[in-house]
From Swiss-Prot:
An annotated GO BP: mitochondrial genome maintenance
Source organism per UniProt: Danio rerio
Alphabetical keyword list: Membrane, Mitochondrion, Mitochondrion inner membrane, Repeat, Transmembrane, Transmembrane helix, Transport
Domain of life where this protein originates: Eukaryota
Solcar repeat locations: 4-108, 116-203, 224-308
Organism lineage: Eukaryota, Metazoa, Chordata, Craniata, Vertebrata
Location(s) in or outside the cell: Mitochondrion inner membrane
Protein's UniProt keywords contain Flavoprotein: no
Official protein name in the record: Solute carrier family 25 member 36-A
Length: 311
């Protein structure tokens, strides 16, 4: 891969990540609130009837719409964009590093394994994920802390710089890498995602080659390609997210300020014992609703920018 090709993939990946982050930020905030232990702040009591006819109170976490309503009522609409600054600062380099590492790894591994085989896509996605996570974890920790900083209307909100200072004062440099073990566990999601995506993409290309699309108008072919890539990205991400979601909850818990959670397996065990297995999937619906359009937008923007720059 030439230096120009690497720069094209860097720029395209950054553009895709930035556009997706801006459009889906409110859903990201709601998801993070639902994943955290601070969701207990919003928990309400539900009256349940027992066998003897008596009633007992059970604590029930809010659903996505209820959480969204509470954020709007207590904190205002601006809170739905908490953490957008660090997100924009981090998403471009993160996606750029990821796609550049993915493309470079795939080119190298094609010389070792069968070109464009499943092994190539899995290893390339894993190496790219590891590289991006290691480089950008401090940014995502700050983003999570800001999203969890619930303040009522009129109260002074914590800035990104203040958050950085507090993390350093309490935990030092190591504090910026909290939750990284859960992110490494989440590489499995990335691997599954890209294996499915590349498989669907290859099938679409084969279908196009075997069809009579040459007789169609150019605009019709472009529209068909766009829809195909959107569906490929959405399908692959939905499957991957549903399988690997618990690591998202563990990562958010590890990044909480003053957290009682210390390591990946300790957090996994504590959440399971104290809140049950359902807590490991809290926020999944919101996550899927956000990830499907976010990933589709990101991947299509990436493909479009690469196509335009390569002429």
């Amino acid at each position: 891969m030439s230096q120009r090709d690497t720069l094209v993939h860097l720029f395209a990946g950054g553009c895709g990540g930035t556009v997706g982050a801006i459009l889906t930020c409110p859903l990201e905030v709601v998801k993070t609130r639902l994943q955290s232990s601070s969701v207990t702040f919003y928990i309400s009591e539900v009256q349940l009837s027992t066998v003897n006819g008596a009633s007992v109170a059970r604590m029930a976490p809010p659903g996505p719409l209820h959480c969204l309503k509470l954020i709007l009522e207590k904190e205002g609409p601006r809170s739905l964009f908490r953490g957008l600054g660090p997100n924009l600062v981090g998403v471009a380099p993160s996606r750029a590093i990821y796609f550049a590492a993915y493309s470079t790894s795939k080119e190298k591994l094609n010389n070792v394994f069968d070109p464009d085989s499943t092994q190539v896509h899995m290893l390339s996605a894993g190496l790219a994920g590891f590289t991006a996570i290691t480089a950008t974890n401090p940014i995502w920790l700050i983003k999570t802390r800001l999203q969890l900083d619930a303040r009522n209307r009129g109260e002074r909100r914590m800035s990104a710089f203040e958050c950085v200072r507090r993390v350093y004062q309490s935990d030092g440099l190591r504090g910026f890498y909290r939750g990284m073990s859960a992110s490494y566990a989440g590489i499995s999601e990335t691997v599954i995602h890209f294996v499915i995506y590349e498989s669907i993409k290859r099938k679409l290309i084969e279908h196009k080659a075997n069809s009579n699309m040459d007789d169609e108008d150019e605009s019709v072919k472009d529209a068909s390609d766009f829809v195909g890539m959107m569906l490929a990205a959405a399908t692959s991400k939905t499957c991957a997210t549903s399988i690997a979601y618990p690591h998202e909850v563990i990562r958010t818990r590890l990044r909480e300020e003053g957290s009682k959670y210390r390591s990946f397996f300790q957090t996994l065990n504590m959440v399971f014992r104290e809140e049950g297995y359902r807590a490991l999937y809290r926020g999944l619906t919101t996550h899927l609703v956000r990830q499907i359009p976010n990933t589709a937008i990101m991947m299509c923007t990436y493909e479009l920018v690469v196509y335009l720059l390569n002429g």
